[in-house]
């Protein structure tokens, strides 16, 4: 599998994850709308608020990953993919296999 194919697969998986998390977030928001507005005295209120924050954080993380994957796809088009953005050395194939959207080598990432 080429780097572009691997990135395209990762992009599709990330888009699917964003869609699932968006649906889950919408469900949590709907549940919070039908719960007691007084979170302090509603035993489920705090749980719903926590779940809403957790899903929102996961959604934000997935959106950032999509931006990283799109940037990596752009680097494949320019021929810069697999080269560290900081030091210019090649990024180890093992790192790219684990994190295809990586823009830095292990040394620079530390």
Predicted regions mapped to residue ranges:
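Cysteine-rich micro-motifs
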Residues: 99-110
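Short Cys/His-rich "knuckle" micro-motifs
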Residues: 70, 94-99
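Solvent-exposed, flexible loop/coil residues
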Residues: 54, 85, 100
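Short functional micro-motifs and their immediate structural scaffolds
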Residues: 91-92, 110
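Glycine-centered loop/turn positions within well-structured domains
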Residues: 82, 94, 103
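Interaction interfaces in information-processing and related assembly proteins
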Residues: 1-78
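Short, cysteine/histidine-rich loop/knuckle motifs that typically chelate Zn2+
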Residues: 85-87, 107
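Short metal-coordination and nucleic-acid-contact micro-motifs, chiefly zinc-binding Cys/His arrays
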Residues: 77-80, 101
